Amino acid sequence: MDKLLRVENLNKDKILHKVSFEMEQGEMLAIMGPSGSGKSTLLYNVSGMDQPTGGKVWLGDTEITGLSEDAKADLRLHRMGFIFQQMNMIANLNILDNILLPVMQANKGKGGKSKSELIAEAKRRMRQLSISELGSRQITQVSGGQLQRACICRSIMNEPEILFADEPPGALNKSAAGEVVAELLKLNQEGMSILIVTHDSKVASTCDRIIYLLDGDIRGELGLGKLENSMEKQREERVNRWLMDMGW
């Protein structure tokens, strides 16, 4: 498999210390660790939303850390998708307009798809995520799980090479969280590469591989391979045993 993401000796002030790892095309990789271990900081620095104080990051053949801020913003808009626990929806826009916002910006002045084509694409993806009836609603008129599925829809509208997810089901109840994880797993099974920060062993057990971060250092790694439904319980038990060995 091709290396999609390469991180080499990444430093960030006193938070990250020469962090190095690689991610393959089509992989679902979890970053775990206790609060304050540097998980979210790692995600922000790898994706170019923050500038590390040392080290390099590549997405494919593009060195992200060597780009200007404008070039990094353009790369995030066209080649990355993002899902955050806080969801980052615009309060005065309805669900459909929120979903369309980034991809409309990405298509502006580039001779890409028309607005009607993008709306049709958004509605198709909304049907896939079981939120087709929510397009005209305001963000205050839907449940947390529905809103997070709308965030997933928004994040994949530009057909990104990689999806970054920072505790996506963290603020949801158990049922809604399970639905969100199932949607992410479905995307991965369709070929989407996903880097997910999580403190939840059940979420991590659906991933192909887990990296354990402590005090800004990678302290361990667990390879699980692709999930088979019949092995779900055994995988979670294996992850929990490994986390105990890591000092979780």
Predicted regions and their residues:
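Conserved ABC ATPase "signature" region
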Residues: 63, 107, 113-134
